[in-house]
């Protein structure tokens, strides 16, 4: 009965979702990005659209929470493309309202090391590059200096005390590492990059599966199987791949550590090309396509962003990777409803699960806007 139900779902999806082959035009990319960005800003405080399948996704997100931080990363990219200053104004207002501080959940010392709470700093640095106002970045630099002078000595093991003071869950590689490179570039001080590289390697040594070229979400998944397959969560690996792209985008290609990231990026890109679904998305359990036929737009958008970024920067061959990017982007666009809401965003979690046609989440919108920014360039946008 279970297998019959799965087959029925797959057949339904094959008939529901078209095989995407329509040409991508830069003006249409910009149009759909605006529609999604405008919908999100208008409905940012409306909890009715948020998936409600866990206690973690019921309340309003703090404006500096990682969920919103991921949104702001994508919104910053859209703001740089838009024909209006209102998106920069919206982002700037958030920073001003919070004195340009990073998220301080549960008090300063309780979370000073936590990667999630660093995410919003990436947007502060994007805004600094536009407005040249040092108050936008000073709190971030001060906090990172504190971390450098008082580095966490906890182990990477998931059960270690204060274990998330280190980047021991794969999502962290999106949240914090790009910001360390930004700080280094601004201050012209190598110590921030050195710290980032050391911690990234520690995370990779802990979570990266060298056979599959994918990351476990955290150490609690090492010995678990889902329908007989290893559990590689799509959004978790999306965080990694987008974070990897963002680190490389900030890092000088001549930097001594760039080849390390380049090698890792190429391995992941090759794997992602192999496991993309015919419909254009990636299964929520990356190696379990037949068990997770429902589309999911946050992890997939991050993959599209990273792949398109690689083509645009001459790292990936367009003839090889371009069709996958095109198929993926068209699939994501098909899940934007007529009002501009991006659907099928998996709720907050740590493993494969469910996604819904009438629900969204802020980080999914951020991923979509990030993807659109590179798709726009790839198809001739100026």
Residues of each region from the PLM?
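Acidic/Ser/Thr-rich, low-complexity mid-to-C-terminal regulatory regions of eukaryotic proteins
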Residues: 214-235
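CBM-like carbohydrate-recognition segments
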Residues: 25-69, 81-88, 97-115, 119-121, ...
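Bacterial Sec-dependent N-terminal signal peptides
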Residues: 1-24
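Long, well-ordered core segments of solenoidal/helical folds
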Residues: 30-49, 89-107, 138-158, 190-216, ...
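Inter-helical turn/loop segments and adjacent helix faces that build the functional surface
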Residues: 82, 183-194, 247-259, 312-318
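Oxyanion-binding "anion nests"
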Residues: 239-287
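Acidic/serine-rich, low-complexity amphipathic helices located in mid- to C-terminal regulatory regions
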Residues: 171-186
């Amino acid at each position: 009965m279970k297998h019959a139900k799965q087959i029925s779902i797959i057949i339904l999806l094959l008939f529901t979702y078209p095989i995407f082959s329509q040409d991508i035009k830069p003006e249409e990319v910009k149009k759909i990005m605006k529609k999604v960005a405008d919908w999100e800003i208008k409905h940012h405080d409306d909890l009715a659209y948020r998936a409600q399948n866990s206690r973690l996704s019921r309340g309003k997100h703090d404006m500096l929470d990682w969920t919103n931080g991921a949104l702001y990363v994508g919104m910053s990219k859209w703001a740089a493309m838009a024909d209006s200053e209102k998106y920069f104004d919206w982002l700037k207002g958030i920073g001003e309202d919070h004195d340009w501080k990073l998220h301080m959940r549960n008090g300063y010392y309780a979370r000073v090391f936590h990667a999630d709470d660093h995410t919003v700093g990436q947007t502060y640095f994007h805004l600094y590059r536009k407005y040249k106002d040092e108050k936008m970045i000073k709190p971030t630099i001060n906090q990172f200096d504190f971390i450098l002078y008082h580095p966490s000595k906890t182990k990477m093991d998931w059960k270690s005390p204060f274990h998330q003071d280190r980047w021991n869950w794969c999502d962290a590689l999106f949240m914090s590492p790009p910001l360390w490179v930004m700080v280094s570039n601004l201050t012209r001080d190598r110590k921030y990059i050195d710290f980032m590289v050391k911690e990234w390697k520690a995370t990779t040594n802990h979570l990266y599966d060298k056979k599959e070229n994918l990351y476990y979400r955290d150490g609690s998944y090492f010995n678990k199987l889902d329908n007989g397959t290893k559990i590689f969560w799509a959004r978790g690996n999306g965080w990694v791949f987008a974070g990897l792209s963002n680190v490389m985008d900030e890092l000088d290609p001549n930097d001594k550590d760039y080849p390390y990231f380049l090698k890792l990026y190429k391995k992941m890109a090759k794997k992602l090309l192999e496991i993309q679904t015919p419909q254009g998305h990636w299964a929520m359990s990356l190696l379990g396509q037949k068990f997770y036929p429902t589309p999911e737009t946050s992890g997939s958008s991050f993959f599209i962003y990273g792949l398109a970024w690689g083509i645009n920067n001459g790292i990936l061959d367009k003839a090889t990777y371009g069709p996958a990017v095109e198929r993926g982007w068209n699939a994501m666009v098909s899940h934007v409803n007529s009002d501009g809401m991006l659907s099928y965003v998996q709720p907050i979690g740590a493993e494969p699960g469910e996604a819904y046609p009438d629900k969204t989440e802020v980080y999914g919108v951020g991923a979509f806007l990030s993807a659109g920014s590179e798709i726009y360039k790839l198809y001739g946008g100026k």
